Amino acid sequence: MASRRDVLIMLGVGLAAATAGVVLAPRLGHPPAGSEIAALRGARLTGLDGQPARLDALNQHILVCNFWATWCPPCVEEIPALMRVRESYKARNVEFVGIAIDQAAKVREFATKLAISYPVFLADESGIELVRTLGNPSGGLPFTLVFDRSRQVAARKLGALSEQEMARMLDQALAS
């Protein structure tokens, strides 16, 4: 039978562990503020033409960065919605980019077939590690980040987005 002292010690340890979990949980999986855009700018990306590509040219825009693959059904399903939202926010300095973690030939064929209206880049084999660095520890797809004008992550979502969710995320980024 445990003594009163042992019970109090166990309660104290449990309380300390719970407190640590509450304090640390929001930080796990999310990189320090500002490091996301640096990781994205430093990523080895190529355009659909096979040439190296960089995201530096999009500095004045709210940036929506969507990681996807042709073999990912939720990714494929959300692309038409992303194109529609992009069209409705284009005049408000919002730019979309897609980063495919896939084989170049499949992405080129798919992007042509769907007539994807925003820039599409290819990540090399380090693409999954890049999404982990950007706050997606599971490496799952689709994964979307919204960067505000100050280049901070305004929103992130693992999983497919609806048009309404994307509009809410963009409205919040535009308001900040």
Residue ranges: model-predicted function:
Residues 112-116, 125-171:
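Thiol/disulfide oxidoreductase modules built on the thioredoxin-like
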Residues 58-61, 91, 117:
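Active-site acidic short loop of glycosyltransferases
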Residues 76-115, 125-131:
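Structural microenvironment flanking redox-active thiols in thiol-disulfide oxidoreductases
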Residues 40-41, 63, 141-142:
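Short loop/turn microsegments at loop-to-beta-strand junctions
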Residues 43, 67-68, 110, 118:
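Conserved hydrophobic/aromatic "anchor" residues
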Residues 1-42:
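N-terminal targeting signals for export/organelle localization
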Residues 55-72:
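Short active-site neighborhood of thiol/selenol oxidoreductases, capturing the structured segment around
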